[in-house]
């Protein structure tokens, strides 16, 4: 294969900061259902590369259908890594564990003069490989020698109490996190407890590194080639509905039943099932929970209704997840602030009948340009970063008794029906109070029209200050 030979035989020349030119780290982004695995396999075969999966659920053994793993036959066509190697009962596998193993694999692939192709839908896993953004903490051990994930332990506590403790040890980070965001609050507390250094201080140090930016440290590998597969939302929604139907036809229910019998029955009998950690957070478990736990214990009609309910829920949550993935790409890749932001090349995948000319050939041309040290002829996707917008600003709405994090969210809240309803209610109360005292005073301070105007003016000022 000429392409594979070209990929391995990269000549030495001046390149990134005077270093030898390096092979690219190919990264394929995209929502579920866009064909990321297909493109990765095609590029891997043509370029002699190896595929590194970046999917937080595919690391676990089992549930091959619901986690949409590539088949055993496809894995034989091109070397795949980071699939089916964690015991399903492990609930403490983290992005740090993933990063440590995956970066070592990538460095080994580079050392063998091959191209690593990172592909998957867990975008924060991909971020951990592209940028130096994670903080490594030391796991704690119990007296029995059992390793304990402190973050998981903290998440069992009350969210407001956790946030109060974080405010005492790291007020800067606490001001950026909502008390309901228990995972992030617990993570920040874990960092402080296990290192003695506040989470915000760690982030300041990362930002101060050469190449660092507001979202973390510098690039980990010097020559990333990022491809983003995207499709028309209506087309993708239809495709995802069909994917669920195909998964059902492939044996999804039997896979869930078997896994449920082996791993989850004991937890359910003890009322300790956990759909927040490990493989049990896979899309599909929660949606079919009621169907699986009542199967054989209710009438066929009821069971069939629960099955239909689970199928519809699975389709809806899959489509919501695809939207979330695209938002992450736009916010964390396309409009990422800072100096170490590589270009992202978009590939339109709405019409699969034109895959060869619209996706595969352009992708090959882009990667080959990186291999040869040339700038691709394709134009990268760009989105402007709004420097004035603070996504972690703290706002307290006394009217609604709510904490809002982020300028955009605050502006949206001020325009929301719930806030406007509370504002209207407050105005009525103010006017009623004025009317009650009106007979006792003719002071202009008690003029209802003036109070109404001031209330409207105050709300308008809030909007102007927040938009």
Swiss-Prot record:
Q: Which Pfam families does the annotation name?
A: IPPT, zf-C2H2_jaz
Q: Which UniProt keywords apply?
A: ATP-binding, Cytoplasm, Metal-binding, Mitochondrion, Nucleotide-binding, Nucleus, Phosphoprotein, Transferase, Transit peptide, tRNA processing, Zinc, Zinc-finger
Q: Where is the transit peptide?
A: 1-47
Q: Where are the zinc fingers (Matrin-type)?
A: 395-425
The UniProt catalytic activity note for this protein reads: adenosine(37) in tRNA + dimethylallyl diphosphate = N(6)-dimethylallyladenosine(37) in tRNA + diphosphate
Phosphoserine sites (modified residues): 443, 455
**Annotated region Core aggregation region: where?**
221-230
Name the enzyme's class: transferase
Query: Where is region (Disordered) located?
Result: 432-467
Checking CDD domains in the record gives: NK
Enumerate the SUPFAM superfamilies for this protein: beta-beta-alpha zinc fingers (SSF57667), P-loop containing nucleoside triphosphate hydrolases (SSF52540)
Q: Where is this region: Interaction with substrate tRNA?
A: 55-58, 183-187, 281-283, 313-331
Q: Which residues bind dimethylallyl diphosphate?
A: 32-37
Query: What are the EC numbers?
Result: 2.5.1.75
Q: Name one GO cellular component term.
A: nucleus
Entry's Gene Ontology BP terms: mitochondrial tRNA modification; tRNA modification
State one molecular function term (GO).
tRNA dimethylallyltransferase activity
Stretch list, region Interaction with isopentenylpyrophosphate transferase: 233-255
Interaction with substrate tRNA, annotated site positions? 122, 206
State the similarity comment. Answer: Belongs to the IPP transferase family.
- Write out the function statement from the record: Catalyzes the transfer of a dimethylallyl group onto the adenine at position 37 of both cytosolic and mitochondrial tRNAs, leading to the formation of N6-(dimethylallyl)adenosine (i6A37). Mediates modification of a limited subset of tRNAs: tRNA(Ser)(AGA), tRNA(Ser)(CGA), tRNA(Ser)(UGA), as well as partial modification of the selenocysteine tRNA(Ser)(UCA). TRIT1 is therefore required for selenoprotein expression.
Q: What is this protein called?
A: tRNA dimethylallyltransferase
State the organism of origin.
Mus musculus
Read off the lineage from the record.
Eukaryota, Metazoa, Chordata, Craniata, Vertebrata
